[in-house]
A protein has these predicted regions:
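Structural signal for interior beta-strand "rungs" in well-ordered beta-sheet cores
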Residues: 83-119
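A solvent-exposed beta-alpha-beta segment
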Residues: 2-61
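Glycine-centered flexibility motif
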Residues: 13, 37, 47, 64, ...
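Phosphate-bearing ligand-interacting subdomains
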Residues: 36-92
């Protein structure tokens, strides 16, 4: 069973969860530092972002603010981070996409493109 932990339980996180579900993640959980949030898009919030390493799961950051996303990603081990690509995105065969990046529905990424980590 594929399990995904998403850091950030808000609108961007809901979009990331939808992509994850569409590409085969069966279990999705959230981590967020706002203790008043208990669910996001029907998925449980099970802890603070600093606790994400306590479970055996792939990890992605579902926070829209690029600066905050970068700061959090730098504190995480690369081997846990995954890249998510929506099935309705068009990605050329030779594209290189860094870990922690999410490619949204309708995106077109042309040949020769390189996308960094956490974009």
């Amino acid at each position: 069973m594929r399990k995904l932990a998403i850091i950030g339980a808000s609108g961007h996180g809901r979009v990331v969860a939808d992509i994850a579900r569409r590409i085969g993640y069966c279990e999705i959980v959230f981590f967020d530092d706002d203790e008043s949030i208990h669910e996001c898009g029907g998925y449980p919030v099970i802890g603070k972002s600093s606790e994400v390493g306590t479970i055996d799961a792939d990890v992605i950051i579902g926070i829209g603010n690029a600066g905050v996303r970068k700061q959090i990603q730098e504190s995480l081990p690369d081997e846990k981070l995954v890249t998510l690509i929506h099935p309705d995105a068009v990605v050329a065969e030779d594209v290189v996409i860094g870990k922690g990046t999410v490619v949204m529905a309708g995106a077109v990424i042309n040949p020769g493109v390189r996308i960094g980590k956490g974009c």
